[in-house]
Each structure stands twice: as structure tokens, then as C-alpha cells.
């Protein structure tokens, strides 16, 4: 038997070449974009918190080493995901940002050290507010004249969803602030959550009624709050902890974070009773250990603790870095684990033909959730080899019949992190990926190639649109919230129409009403005249669609939402994009070069676009679809700052702010701050003592500003 090649360790970020970094940056950016959408908008995460955090850490490390890769579309510059469209949008007066994470005690020490250096203080002179990190749905409540006027989810940090009617049903949210002398405008922020006991009771009722079972309290809280009918929300026992604020007119009611928490209580809000004031790093770490010990006994889910600089004036001085405040951090807990038996491995076929092994488990409770299924990713993962060739589980393979260790960190689909070899039965069966697709056609299965042309770890059915499993997944994507977003046409309805032969391709959706005289949908159980009329109205409402949504809805491999947006902005209109795609498919070198020059577009996407439009079948699908819909031109990105997208270098001594404060301000306004001067530099801000960088600026003809000129520029 030939020897298996030894898996390679992942390349350290410090050893990546610029070309390698660019490829991995694009891949990670797309992954993070998808997972942010699944978590924040769909309430349906597909990876664990630990997996997500690892993706984010590596992505941030690449951007730190190669800052030229950072763009306005980078996940590092965003928070959460855009509002879904099911509710009216609300723009936050003050953005709702996310937090950086600490995973080890050393990370906490570094966090405190950075703050002390920024403020030029000793570590022991800084007090911190410490509180449990509630695993729920972030919310902003706006009060005007003491009356609740708007409640909005976090969304993408800039815009959220208006859930005011639903929030009014929560007993923890006062309709009118208690007391008197409140600010004219006050935004109270916090977390909507569901207790573990309420979650279990709700799932029991859902099960008895034959309705959807929620995976965990966080998903149940999010799903309960984001209901169209407030009566449903009112029937769900939701709580709210207040812990922060957004816009406040005039002077804040307190000078410290802990003072604001007390003020929230006076106004009628519930705050977390475990919140503490800590005076040192040691006290922060002791608080983390104490809360972790209490975690299992708490009646609500938490996934860590949060530390915040207590003095509000220091918070304001520290400011923000990209999508996170510099003055706060989340100290996460390790993921929860359990052991169970892997009973079987089944194959699922995805939209692009990818074959994914799914492990069927002996049901086991992990963190309050009963887990029965687990993704096993691909054949290499099962063999103990990672995506980049690294060794997993010390090389131990996973076999049917094995006792496995399951890890869950607040997610829906957990992961196998280890195999208990001592418990492996003699009859345990190694897994071998089938050579043909499990679809009725049994078409051949091939391994996908990597970006370097090597055989990859993922297998794919070669049936393309002939494979019914792929066809139906394409249609589900087309009608999904992030594509055409057709209300009333969910996955179950798509599957039913497909099985009946009524919808075989996207254009069929828009001809349903014409064909309904023969189909008679209203006579089908579960429909009726009103629901059919509503469905047809919803379909008609989507006959106009944004270019980026249309491109995404085509379901081309490697063309997710971010890539679709980049293509839409690059070409501007459907006609221009369509013409370019046909030329790329025909091998036109000029068209290929033009597409390659677009931001975030590389060889993998170009090959995918070419392959898609080279197929007669696909071109026919597109042609028939464009006869039914109107595709709107792409909107140009808005630039609100005079220094947005500009590259700035600071040199010399700044007298009105620290260097860190100047850098933070520039980045907050959309500029890129560099440590060296080149021809691509737009501004050099020079203070007393400016040396070689000032000379370089003069050499390259870069505009040089004094500190006062800089402050005047950014004030415009």
C-alpha cells in the first residue's frame, strides 16, 4: 500500500508571501462575510464560535502584516451583517460596534498594557467594569422625552431592523423611563435573551405543535424577537439586560461605566447583578475564573466576560479601532464538550455539487442543546488532515462506530475535535467517499483543484444542472433572502414545486401565475386563494432587482455576496457585466485582464465565471430569466469623509493629540495610516522634529500638512 503523504502544517502568517497572503485574504474575507450573515441576520450559524474566532484571528493577522490588503469592504471594517429586509431599517445615530476578543490571560494583560500606554498611565491607576457576556441579541432602545420611540437590532452596526412593536412586549423594557430629568434623547443598549428554563419549555411546546425546534437560547431569543406578529413575541419569555448607551443629548448622567449602570437601574431597567468594578489585571482574571465556575448554574447562556474602562472620559480618549472600541474587550470561555458515538456518515450534495459528509450521532447534550448531527467537512478531515494539510487530532481518523468528542461554542452545527481510540470497537468502519453522486443519476465524483492546481480536499458531483440535488439547491439560493428574497417561497415550497415539475429553473418562478390555470395551486392543501394571491404578489414585487443580488442569485461557484458586489460595482450595469462574461468565457484576453483588475476578483472567480457562461444551458437560463425581470444598475459607494480611501503618514511630534489618537481618528474617517512614505501616499502630517519621512514626502511631491491644517481638513 502506498504511503500517505504527511500532512503539512499551516504556513505561519509571518512566512506568507504577498501573493499567498492575497489569496488567503480573499478566501477568509468571503468565509467571514458568509458566517457574519448566517449569525447576525439568519440566526442560523453553521460553525462554532471557536472556529469563527480562529478565522477572524488569522484574517486580522494577515491584514496587520499586509495593511495594503485592507479595503472598505473588508470584514475587519464591518460589524455584524446588513438588515434582512423583513423589517423597516433604522440607522443608528451612534454605530453599534463589536468587541475584540481575548482568549488567554496574557491577552488580557496585553489589553490593559495597551490602554495604559495610550493614556500614559500606570496599569494600577485604571479601573475596569467587568460583566458577564450575555449570549443573546444586541438591541438599541431610543427614548425621546423619556418615552420609548424606537427599538432596533444591531444589524451591520450602522443600520438595524425596527422591532419597536415587539420590544414593547418585554417586561424588562420600560415604556417610559422612571424618575425625572432624563436627557431629551437617550439610547439605552443591551442584550435580549431567553433563560435556559424558558428555552426548554418553549421547545417542548414547539415540538408538541409540530413547529421548528430551536437549537439554543440565543437562536430562540433572536427568532422570537424578529417576528412579524408582536403577539408571538409577547408569548415568548424574553429578558433584557441594559449595559451600554448610544446617543445621549447633553452631558451623560454619570462619569463612569458603573455609574451609568446604576442610572439604568434608576430608570427602570434590569442590569446584570454580577457586574463588578475591578482595579487591576489580577482582579479581572479572578472575575473571569469566578464567572466561569458559576456558568453552569446561571439560568442564561454566557460565552465569556466583558471588561470596559470605567471612566467615560477615558473611553472617549481611547476611541475606536476599525469596528471595535479600544477601551473594551471580551474575554471568551473555552468551548463546551461532550462524548458520544458516531452511528453513521451520510452524504449531502450542495448547490455547487460539493459532497459533504455528515455524521449521525447518538443524541448527546452539549451546553443545553441536544446534538444529533455534526458536519465532517470532507474526506481529508475524516482522515485527520486539515484544509491546509495540517495534522488534526494528532492524525487520528474518524470511523463509523467510534466514540468521538463533540465541541460546541454557542453554534448550531458542532464539530468533532477528537476520537477516543481506547473506546474504538473492533467492528468500527473506516469511511470512504463514494465515487459516484448519491443522486439518481449516479454521476462521477471528482476532487476539486486548489488555487495552485493541486488536488483539493473537497469532492464534487460532475452532474452540474443535470443533478437534481444541485438543481433544487440552486433554486433555493435563487429565492433566498440574500438573493431575490421572495416572501412565501421558502425551501419547502421550492422543493415541493420542483418535485411537482412546476419550477425547474428560475424563470419558471415568474411564469407560475400564467400557468396557474392548469396548476390550480389554490386547490392544494395548505394553500388557498389568499395565500396563492399573496405568493404571486410577492413574486411580482421582485421583478426589479439590484445587480449584485442578481449576480449572486445565478449561483456561480466562488461568487458569494461580497464577490457579486465587487463585480456589480466594477461593471455598473447588467449589460456591461453580461458582455464581459461572454467575452471572458470566449477567452478574450482583454476582458479577462479587465475583470482581473477589479478589487477582490482573482483567477478562481474568473475561471468560475468563464465556466458558467461557456455552458449553453446556463446562458439559456440567464436569457429566459432576464426576459422576466429588470436588473437595476449598481449604486456607487458613498464617500462621506474628505480623507476616505486616502493614505496618511504622521511624523514628528503632535501637540494637540497623541500619535495613537491621531491614527485612530484617521482610520475612523476611512483613511489608511501607513508607517512609510511612498508615491501612493496622499498626505504627510508633520509636527516639530519631523525627519526622514518629511524629506521623502518632499522627494515624492506628497502634500505636507501641519497639525492644524490636518485638524481643519478632517473637520470639513
Curated annotation (Swiss-Prot):
Its cofactor is Mg(2+); Mn(2+). GO terms for molecular function: DNA ligase (NAD+) activity; metal ion binding. PROSITE patterns: BRCT (PS50172), DNA_LIGASE_N1 (PS01055), DNA_LIGASE_N2 (PS01056). It catalyses: NAD(+) + (deoxyribonucleotide)n-3'-hydroxyl + 5'-phospho-(deoxyribonucleotide)m = (deoxyribonucleotide)n+m + AMP + beta-nicotinamide D-nucleotide. It comes from the Bacteria. Residues 638-716 form the BRCT domain. Disulfide bonds: none annotated. DNA ligase that catalyzes the formation of phosphodiester linkages between 5'-phosphoryl and 3'-hydroxyl groups in double-stranded DNA using NAD as a coenzyme and as the energy source for the reaction. It is essential for DNA replication and repair of damaged DNA. Belongs to the NAD-dependent DNA ligase family. LigA subfamily. This is DNA ligase. It comes from Bradyrhizobium sp. (strain BTAi1 / ATCC BAA-1182). The lineage of its organism: Bacteria, Pseudomonadati, Pseudomonadota, Alphaproteobacteria, Hyphomicrobiales.
Amino acid at each position: 500500500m502506498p504511503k500517505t503523504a504527511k500532512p503539512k502544517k499551516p504556513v505561519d502568517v509571518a512566512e506568507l508571501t504577498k501573493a499567498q497572503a492575497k489569496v488567503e485574504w480573499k478566501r477568509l474575507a468571503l468565509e467571514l462575510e458568509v458566517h457574519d450573515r448566517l449569525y447576525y441576520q439568519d440566526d442560523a450559524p453553521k460553525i462554532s464560535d471557536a472556529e469563527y474566532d480562529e478565522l477572524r484571528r488569522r484574517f486580522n493577522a494577515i491584514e496587520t502584516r499586509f495593511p495594503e490588503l485592507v479595503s472598505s469592504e473588508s470584514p475587519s471594517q464591518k460589524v455584524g451583517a446588513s438588515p434582512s429586509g423583513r423589517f423597516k431599517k433604522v440607522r443608528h445615530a451612534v454605530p453599534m460596534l463589536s468587541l475584540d476578543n481575548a482568549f488567554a490571560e496574557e491577552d488580557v494583560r496585553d489589553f490593559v498594557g495597551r490602554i495604559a500606554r495610550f493614556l500614559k498611565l500606570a496599569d494600577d491607576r485604571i479601573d475596569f467594569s467587568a460583566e458577564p457576556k450575555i449570549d443573546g441579541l444586541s438591541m438599541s432602545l431610543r427614548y425621546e422625552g423619556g418615552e420609548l420611540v424606537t427599538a432596533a437590532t444591531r444589524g451591520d452596526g450602522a443600520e438595524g431592523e425596527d422591532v419597536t412593536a415587539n420590544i414593547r412586549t418585554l417586561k424588562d423594557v420600560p415604556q417610559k423611563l422612571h424618575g425625572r430629568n432624563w436627557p431629551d434623547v437617550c439610547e439605552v443598549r443591551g442584550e435580549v435573551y431567553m433563560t435556559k428554563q424558558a428555552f426548554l419549555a418553549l421547545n417542548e411546546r414547539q415540538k408538541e405543535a409540530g413547529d421548528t425546534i430551536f437549537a439554543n437560547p440565543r437562536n430562540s431569543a433572536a427568532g422570537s424577537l424578529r417576528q412579524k406578529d408582536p403577539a408571538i413575541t409577547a408569548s415568548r419569555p424574553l429578558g433584557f439586560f441594559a449595559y451600554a448607551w448610544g446617543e445621549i443629548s447633553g452631558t451623560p448622567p454619570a462619569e463612569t461605566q458603573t455609574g451609568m449602570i446604576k442610572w439604568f437601574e434608576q430608570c427602570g431597567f434590569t442590569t446584570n447583578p454580577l457586574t463588578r468594578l475591578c482595579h487591576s489585571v489580577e482582579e479581572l482574571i479572578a472575575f473571569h475564573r469566578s464567572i466561569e465556575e458559576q456558568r453552569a448554574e446561571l439560568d442564561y447562556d454566557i460565552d465569556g466576560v466583558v471588561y470596559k474602562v470605567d471612566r467615560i472620559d477615558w473611553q472617549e480618549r481611547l476611541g475606536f479601532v476599525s469596528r471595535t472600541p479600544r477601551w473594551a474587550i471580551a474575554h471568551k470561555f473555552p468551548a463546551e464538550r461532550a462524548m458520544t458515538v458516531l452511528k453513521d456518515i451520510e452524504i449531502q450534495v450542495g448547490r455547487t455539487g460539493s459532497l459533504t459528509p455528515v455524521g449521525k450521532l447518538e443524541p448527546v447534550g452539549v451546553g443545553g442543546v441536544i446534538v444529533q448531527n455534526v458536519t465532517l467537512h470532507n474526506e481529508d478531515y475524516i482522515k485527520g488532515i486539515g484544509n491546509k494539510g495540517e495534522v488534526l487530532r494528532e492524525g487520528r481518523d474518524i470511523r463509523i462506530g467510534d466514540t468521538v468528542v463533540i465541541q460546541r461554542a454557542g453554534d448550531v452545527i458542532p464539530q468533532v475535535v477528537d476520537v477516543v481510540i481506547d473506546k474504538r470497537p473492533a467492528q468500527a468502519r473506516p469511511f470512504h467517499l463514494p465515487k459516484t453522486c448519491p443522486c439518481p443519476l449516479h454521476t462521477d465524483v471528482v476532487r476539486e483543484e486548489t488555487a495552485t492546481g493541486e488536488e483539493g480536499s473537497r469532492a464534487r458531483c460532475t452532474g452540474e444542472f443535470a443533478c437534481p440535488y444541485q438543481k433544487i439547491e440552486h433554486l433555493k439560493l435563487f429565492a433566498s433572502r440574500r438573493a431575490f428574497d421572495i416572501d412565501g417561497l421558502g425551501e419547502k415550497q421550492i422543493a415541493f414545486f420542483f418535485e411537482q415539475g412546476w419550477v425547474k429553473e428560475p424563470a419558471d418562478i415568474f411564469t407560475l401565475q400564467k400557468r396557474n390555470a392548469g396548476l390550480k395551486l389554490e386547490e392544494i392543501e395548505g394553500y388557498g386563494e389568499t395565500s396563492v394571491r399573496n405568493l404571486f404578489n410577492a413574486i411580482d414585487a421582485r421583478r426589479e432587482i439590484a445587480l449584485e443580488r442578481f449576480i449572486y442569485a445565478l449561483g456561480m461557484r466562488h461568487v458569494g455576496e461580497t464577490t457579486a458586489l465587487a463585480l456589480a460595482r466594477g461593471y455598473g450595469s447588467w449589460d456591461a457585466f453580461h458582455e464581459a462574461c461572454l467575452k471572458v468565457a470566449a477567452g478574450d484576453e482583454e476582458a479577462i485582464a479587465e475583470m482581473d483588475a477589479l478589487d477582490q476578483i482573482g483567477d478562481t472567480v474568473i475561471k468560475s465565471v468563464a465556466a458558467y457562461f461557456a455552458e449553453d444551458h446556463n446562458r439559456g437560463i440567464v436569457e429566459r430569466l432576464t426576459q422576466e425581470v429588470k436588473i437595476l444598475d449598481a449604486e456607487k459607494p458613498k464617500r462621506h469623509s474628505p480623507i476616505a480611501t486616502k493614505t496618511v503618514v504622521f511624523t514628528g511630534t503632535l501637540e494637540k493629540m497623541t500619535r495613537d489618537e491621531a491614527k485612530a481618528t484617521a482610520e475612523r474617517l476611512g483613511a489608511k495610516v501607513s508607517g512609510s512614505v511612498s508615491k501612493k501616499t496622499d498626505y504627510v502630517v508633520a509636527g516639530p522634529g519631523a525627519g526622514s519621512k518629511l524629506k521623502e514626502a518632499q522627494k515624492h511631491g506628497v502634500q505636507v500638512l501641519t497639525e492644524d491644517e490636518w485638524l481643519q481638513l478632517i473637520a470639513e
